[in-house]
Design a protein with these regions (language model features):
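Conserved cytosolic headpiece of P-type ATPases
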Residues: 1-30, 38, 42, 172-175
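Juxtamembrane helix-loop transition segments at the membrane interface in multi-pass membrane proteins
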Residues: 4-15, 36-74, 104-109, 135-160
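Juxtamembrane/transmembrane-helix boundary motifs in multi-pass membrane proteins
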Residues: 13-17, 21, 79-83, 111-123
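Pore-lining and gate-forming transmembrane alpha-helices of multi-pass membrane transport proteins
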Residues: 21, 25, 29, 33, ...
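Loop-to-transmembrane boundary segments
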Residues: 69-91
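Long hydrophobic alpha-helices with heptad-repeat/coiled-coil character
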Residues: 84, 98-115, 119, 174-176
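Terminal membrane-proximal soluble interaction domains of membrane-associated proteins
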Residues: 164-176
């Protein structure tokens, strides 16, 4: 998920244009993420895990609504939650495109040459904590402002992705 997209983008010859390079690498990263999630969702064992993931979201919604945490109450809530880790991963992938492009541009300005693949890998790895921290803050903000029309538009891709990583749980799973 990290080195392969960089190597693939490097192979396209886009290493001189930081934004183009990171759009290619980020696109590959997004395809790998969605493809991996879809592929593992085909396995029955993982499908069951995704049912528990849906139960977790229903439980969180029940708790946040301030109603009794019972199977009957939880059943009425949706399985797609705006502050899900699946959404977080998508935010990381998308935000990294732009923050990595900025880091690459600064590096190129500082050393006056394009980065090697290993230098780019090290640069991106060093910026990853910033990407993760900002992504987490955006995820928290999306939870607080989830009813705002712009927020609903921005969180939609993460909710769509959760259609892969969550399944409708059984009552036994909700009870856990």
């Amino acid at each position: 998920f990290f080195f392969l997209p960089l190597a693939a983008a490097q192979a396209t010859g886009a290493e001189r244009d930081a934004l183009q390079f990171n759009l290619i690498a980020g696109g590959i990263r997004a395809i790998l993420l969605v493809g991996y999630m879809w592929l593992i969702s085909c396995w029955s064992e993982i499908r069951r895990v995704f049912e528990y993931h849906g139960a977790e979201h229903k439980s969180i919604f029940t708790f946040e609504a301030g109603v009794d945490l019972t199977v009957e109450e939880a059943r009425s809530f949706g399985r797609l939650h705006p502050r899900c880790g699946t959404s977080f991963l998508l935010i990381v992938v998308l935000l990294s495109i732009f923050l990595f492009a900025v880091a690459d541009s600064l590096f190129a300005d500082f050393v006056a040459r394009p980065q090697t693949l290993l230098e780019r890998f090290a640069t991106h790895l060093s910026v990853l904590p910033l990407v993760s921290g900002l992504s987490f803050e955006l995820l928290k903000l999306s939870g607080r402002k989830r009813n705002h029309p712009l927020t609903r538009l921005l969180i939609a891709p993460g909710l769509w992705l959760q259609r892969i990583t969550t399944r409708e749980p059984s009552d036994d799973q909700l009870e856990v």
